[in-house]
C-alpha cells in the first residue's frame, strides 16, 4: 500500500518537478493507494487535475467532503469522511 500526502487542499495548477516525480511513482505502484484529504494534484475547490495527478483507491478526507470528491471522482476512488471534532 502507498499513502499519498504529497500535496493538500491548497494545491493549484501543476506540480513542481519533485512532486510530479512522486505522483508518477505513486501512480506506477502496484496495489492500494490511500490519499489523505485530497489526492495529490487535484484542486480541492474545482476538481481540476494536474498532469500526473494521483489516482487513489481510497481517499480519507477530514470533517466534510470537498467539491473535488464529486468533480474528480475518477482520482478519488472511494471517499470516506473522518470526523475530527470541528
Name each model feature, range by range:
Residues 1-86:
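YjeF_N-associated NAD(P)HX repair module
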